[in-house]
Amino acid sequence: MSTSADGAYHKLSIPAQTHPSGCPIDHEFTTFTPDYLENPYPQLAKIREEHPIFYSKKLGYLVVTRMEDLREVFRDHDVYSSENVQDPVFPICDRAAAILAHEDFNPVAVMSNRQQPDHTRIRKHTQDGFSGRRMKILEPYIQRRSQELIDAMITKGGPVDFVSAFGHPLPGQIIFRFIGFDEADDEQLMSWTGNRLAFTWGNPDEDEQIDIAEKMMKYWRYCRTFVASRFKDRKDDLTSELLNAHEANSEELSYREVESIIYGHSFAGHEIVSNFMSNSLLCLLQQRDNWDAICKDPKLIPNALEEVLRFESPQTSWRRKTNVDTHIAGVDIPAGTQVFLSLGAANHEPSLFDSPAEFDIRRKNARKHISFGHGIHFCLGARLARLEATVAIKALAQRIPSLRLVDGQALDYSANITFRGPKALYIDWDK
């Protein structure tokens, strides 16, 4: 693993944590209980009102729940470092750590977990790849693949699992074409990105950790091989744009940084958007009048999707670490404190959103959510995620307006601290 000044992409050693003096302690709060996984929002509402900032003994994190405080943490990037956002939540076993300590596994921190001033330098070049021109180039592909996946569902006949038939493959295919990956590798790439979710944000057992570590190594080697091939043969894709920037000025963007950006983007652009699509369909179909409304008037879709991001965000938390001693909302916080930012709690804050537990596709301030972050680390792919979801939901509403949820299904959610979306979502329609 990299030991360069750039910093490793994943840091595997987790320093021991103690609760800040004078801060309330919750000995039971964790994101891994069945009740939290089924529906975290009642619990988040309770703790936000009783102790908006508290220390979770089980997670080893200071938990922040109010929108005002979250925005302050995101804004003050000199005090609150993002260096820990790609690190495993819990310690990993020695055998898994040894696999990732190999000199061949050396991605460096680049976007979500890189400190200033390097973050802005790297983001500037990566942002060029998310231009309006590239969105226009990609949109016809999104439309075509949406229609093809709908065709496949109709041909197969319902009921079908929306996640495996549409919600999971479509975002993967889009981000992989955006990066430039070979379509023949899609299935393997999708498997690798799911493994990274469990490793970094979940709590896998030792055997799972070892298996995931081996696959992460293969995934990193794949990314490096792919970038090397693009270096020799440029195309009209994100990787080629990054390599062009590197060649123009290697001090502005290093070759290893290009490799590491590709390693990170193929996960971020897949899992988060997959959850976004599945959560969107779930929320819209749970109340039939909402689905009927967007079928009748597709102009409602963009705001409805913002309400999904507020009400059932695909990313319910993020992390930070204090660089220096600081304080927030009257709580003194020592340097080195791990901070858990509860986006889900803030997005349901009643002082900001009327009747926050209600899903309202016409909510006027739905876009005030914080699901894409805030400040210099605001999600670079937000525009693409919104485009994908808008095209997909519009296509589904036009092609299959009789869509409905299969009655009696119990939704199962992946046990992790950050990402939220059903593992399966069964739907049916009139034949």
Model-assigned labels for residue ranges:
Residues 2-431:
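Cytochrome P450
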